[in-house]
Amino acid sequence: MKKKLIGVFLFMSLICGSVSAQGLPDRKETLKTLVKVNDYFMKKYADYRTPSYNGIIRPSNIWTRGVYYEGLMALHSIFPREDYYNYAYQWADYHKWGMRNGNITRNADDQCCGQVYIDLYNMSSDPEKIRKIKACIDMIVNTPQVNDWTWVDAIQMGMPIYAKLGKLTGEQKYNDKMWDMYSYSRNVHGKNGLFNPKDGLWWRDADFVPPYKEPNGEDCYWSRGNGWAYAALVRVLEEIPADELHRADYINDFLAMSKALKKCQRK
């Protein structure tokens, strides 16, 4: 698995468009497209402080911008450029390495930025970079609650943080909590879980689990949400050790989703 390339491609393909069903595109052409799209974004939003806007003005450190910076850091890992690093660092530093709603937030949309903070910490280990996101996740780890990820997008926003902290600290508690939260969303939330093992796809949230049906009698699966879950599995598998207790479970879900998504792809 070309894990770094796949990781960046999954994220940036959300911007670039669909992937050919005939196999992975040429690496050079893929990289050329990623660089072109990212250069456009950085030029359009040259001021890293620019808030997100989609009818509602939101701070630029929530998920809407955080997922972009995840992709940027992945791109930087295979195609290093000083301006990529500076753009991410200045954004994180402007937000004081913190989250909307502070260190006690349980909202994965708030926590998403923490993935980038950890990536930047791994490049230059100033403890302040991860102090707040680690305090937030430690707070969650130390409570029995596991039902935070009530919509499929949250799996991508929050789950990789636990894997990254587990790798960074060597503490198993992060991987254990990650599995408890993932398996609850997968198997329990909404009565029987958000994952449909028969189809290999995720329902968006409890509003879309059976008996909900579309007018044509079919299940409703959100393409974006399934893309998030698929990306989360890739990012987690990059971080956890080969002997992690539930690694095979994550791989099996990734393979099931791969098969399902291939069937759904447009030509």
Where are these regions (language model features)?
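Bacterial Sec-dependent N-terminal signal peptides
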Residues: 1-25
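Glycan-recognition and catalytic cores of secretory/periplasmic carbohydrate-active enzymes
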Residues: 22-267
